[in-house]
Every structure is written in C-alpha cells, then in structure tokens.
Amino acid sequence: MKTVREMNSGELAAFVCSHLDRYGIRVALSGGAVVSIYASGNYVSKDLDFIDLLQTTRQKLKKVLKQIGFEEKSRYFVSKETEFFIEFPSGPLAVGNEPVEKLAELQFETGRLRLLSPTDCVKDRLSAFYHWGDRQCLQQAVWVAQMKPIDWVEIKRWSRQEGAEEKFVEFRAELQDNSNR
C-alpha cells in the first residue's frame, strides 16, 4: 500500500475513513475535497472535510488519528507526511436546508470512502452560489456536472426548495457555456 506521503486526496480520504471505521467512528467526506475527486483534477482542495455522523468526542478523534500520524493543530489535524489536512465541520450532514439521505461509496487501494454523491456534491456547491453568490463554487458545480451523472430532476426540485430557481437557470446556462468551450 502507498505511504501517506504518496497518496492523493481521494486515497488519503479513503485511508482515513477506513481507519476511523475500524474504531467505530463513522464519517463522510464533504466540501471541496469531494469536488477534487469527482472533477478529475479540475480542482484541488488540501482540506479534507469529514462530517462525523455519530458525534464522536474530539478526544477519541485525536487518539485514533494520532495512530496514523495526524496531530491536532487548532481546528485541523495535520501530518508532516502530507500537505492535506483534516477538518471535522459540525454536522449534521446537509446540503442547503436539507439533510443528506444517501451517501456514495468509492473503493480505493487505500480503503473505502463514504462521501457525498455527485448530485449532492453539486447541490453542496450550488448552495454556496445560491446563498452567498460564490462563483467559484458555481464553477465547481459545473465541473462535477460535466464529469459525473447528475440527477437533474432532483437538483431542480432542491433548487426550487432553496428559493433559487433563477440561479438554477444561471447554473444550467453556465454549464452549457462551459460545454461549448
């Protein structure tokens, strides 16, 4: 198996997720690192945002992550072996105002990774665009939608629920513009 130093973000996230699983700590990857995995190199995030699905104590997380070389530094866990760092944003796991119902799983040489589905990843990025006008997140949503199958009916329904039908139309136009380039 690869060393931590040799792992890309997906491999490291799977390694961490599998290690935590062995100790009864159930996490799911969210945020920009999911974009990195689904958008195949269009975007790189050094921050691995794991949502703790069971509300594990910080003390237990520290103990278990130390076993694989990660030390707590402020709100992050860092290792001398990698430029990637781990964070545990507070849950629950949600996109916009809705909880995530079903997670995706990917198998890597380094372990199994639970993460947002491509559709929920797009919704997560669109949430930042819809509510804060974050155009970088809009671009990330476009990249994922170009690279992975997306449930368009679900994204349209969710966008309506978020009160962002006009911005959904803008997202579709941006996707079309990017496809024509």
Give names to the regions the model predicted:
Residues 1-181:
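Compositionally biased terminal segments of proteins
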